Amino acid sequence: KWRPNCASLIITDTHQRWMQVLSPEIRKWCKGWSYNGSLHTWTDPTTNHVIWCKSYFRPNTQQAHKNPLEGLNISGACFIDECQTFGTPEVAHKALGRLRSGTDPLLIMVGLPIVSDMWMKLVEDADGHIIHATSYANQQNLSKSWFEAAKKTLPPDEYEAMIMNRPKPPKGLIYSEFDELKNVIEN
């Protein structure tokens, strides 16, 4: 249920992910809402609830005080998507700085299961609540063929980590497809 006259914020790591992944989903969820392309906001005409959609990409060459979220006053909820892509808690701290008003502001952080999740440690340290949910746990909404296709197309370790939520510490090669005989050029 949307709170009237509130503003919420959705953050992801890149504009490309916002355009190709989140935007089509939000378009489905927010039928009847109006979209402002220059501000990247969705507004509910009934409650006047606004959802700001931002990508948080700050190259290491920019100073940490530069804040892509600057100026927003969020009074509803803040969602950070793809938390595993952020190497430090910077984006979470900046998002918390935007949650300034309203009744019980809420920060929700979502990401893939990887070993040494900085963002999950941040939640634990703040006595927050962590929910471990996998695609497998959501199987009533996914077809059997979806799981079969995932098993056929993903490497076994990736299937275990991303679908079954059983990540393993990294070992050996970063990319399992790497073949030293094919991919290394010697002088």
Task: Say what each PLM segment does.
Residues 5-18:
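Conserved RecA-like ASCE P-loop NTPase motor core of nucleic-acid helicases/translocases
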